[in-house]
Amino acid sequence: MKDLFRISGVTHFELPLLPNNIPFACHPEFQSISLKIDKWFLGKMRIADETSKKKVLESRIGLYACMMHPHAKREKLVLAGKHLWAVFLLDDLLESSSKHEMPQLNLTISNLANGNSDEDYTNPLLALYREVMEEIRAAMEPPLLDRYVQCVGASLEAVKDQVHRRAEKSIPGVEEYKLARRATGFMEAVGGIMTEFCIGIRLSQAQIQSPIFRELLNSVSDHVILVNDLLSFRKEFYGGDYHHNWISVLLHHSPRGTSFQDVVDRLCEMIQAEELSILALRKKIADEEGSDSELTKFAREFPMVASGSLVWSYVTGRYHGYGNPLLTGEIFSGTWLLHPMATVVLPSKFRMDTMRFSLAPKKRDSFP
């Protein structure tokens, strides 16, 4: 485990400016919609103290939904944002559970997803997911809902395997990690299914089963995970949970003499390669299907999950520390000084041209 000792001694690294050529947008009503989503969460979780409120608001989950589905109808976007909050918390709950708790927890979540549970849950996270799923089942058409339930079930099984491996603190192989993270990320449900739901896309069975549809799902999921593992590394580093991160995996399987910076640079190259893959698939689908195809509509909208995730990963206090003045809505690059409390980057920041809104709420907005 010498690689982990090398990681534990890292104090800083150079963060390049990540590419973001995938079309990016944010819902024009993002301020009021994200506020509504986050206020709903504060109310449901009965969060009253100012410090905890600040953490919720600076996590910017409501804003994340507005970036993932910028062209959604308002009411569907609000529901997608509620679902995003629920899945984030369920993911945290799953990853903090022991391997002995996992089978029952998986069964409970599966039952909540498919509506087979009448139990009253004392765990507020499970109660929250139950309420969200009641809304989703009422709003989502049955074929899409069936696919959603299948996606959640597959992700739960994959998370169970991941928890077992994390308990052993073992580092998987490169391809093994890639496939495992695809499976555990809930991205097909949170990104793919929710894109279809929010935009009103109706894919045929043939389109769903086509290889190029699966390629696009995988490529967007891989891009989201690569960015996540890079920009959340500080949080995982100080949480002691960096065995399952692209940086650890690449370092462990790289030739002798490979530096931490070499691995960061390689990870950034992988992000760029995945971006190019997404753009190529987007064009290929449009060329083959035509502009009116439902699959073309999906290929136009779904990649925004990747670009939205990239931007959100730069502005969330969940990764970079709450109350951090660095999080202004700009993409940053430069020397990243690892610090237990917050992301510190010196000296350069580069404004992102595609982001043309302030993260500050309007004066008329108020929080509970």
Swiss-Prot record:
Residues at which Mg(2+) 3 binds: 228, 232
Motif (DDXXE motif): 91-95
Induction: Up-regulated by alamethicin treatment.
Residues the entry annotates as binding Mg(2+) 2: 91
Domain of life where this protein originates: Eukaryota
Reaction(s) catalysed by this chain's protein: (2E,6E)-farnesyl diphosphate + H2O = (3S,6E)-nerolidol + diphosphate; (2E)-geranyl diphosphate + H2O = (S)-linalool + diphosphate
GO biological process assignments: terpenoid biosynthetic process
Cofactor: how bound: Binds 3 Mg(2+) or Mn(2+) ions per subunit.
Coiled-coil region: none
Gene3D superfamilies from the UniProt entry: Farnesyl Diphosphate Synthase
EC number: 4.2.3.48, 4.2.3.25
Molecular function in Gene Ontology: metal ion binding; S-linalool synthase activity; terpene synthase activity
Record keywords, A-Z: Lyase, Magnesium, Metal-binding
SUPFAM superfamilies according to UniProt: Terpenoid synthases
Binding site for Mg(2+) 1: 91
InterPro entries (UniProt xref): Isoprenoid_synthase_dom_sf, Terpene_cyclase-like_2
Pathway, per record: Secondary metabolite biosynthesis; terpenoid biosynthesis
Cofactor(s) it depends on: Mg(2+); Mn(2+)
Stated role: Sesquiterpene synthase converting farnesyl diphosphate to nerolidol. Also has a monoterpene synthase activity, converting geranyl diphosphate into linalool as the major product. Has no diterpene synthase activity.
More info: Selaginella moellendorffii contains two distinct types of functional terpene synthases (TPS) genes, the typical seed plants TPS genes (SmTPSs) and a microbial type TPS genes (SmMTPSLs).
Record comment regarding domains: The Asp-Asp-Xaa-Xaa-Asp/Glu (DDXXD/E) motif is important for the catalytic activity, presumably through binding to Mg(2+).
Family: Belongs to the terpene synthase family.
Protein name: (3S,6E)-nerolidol synthase
Species this protein is from: Selaginella moellendorffii (Spikemoss)
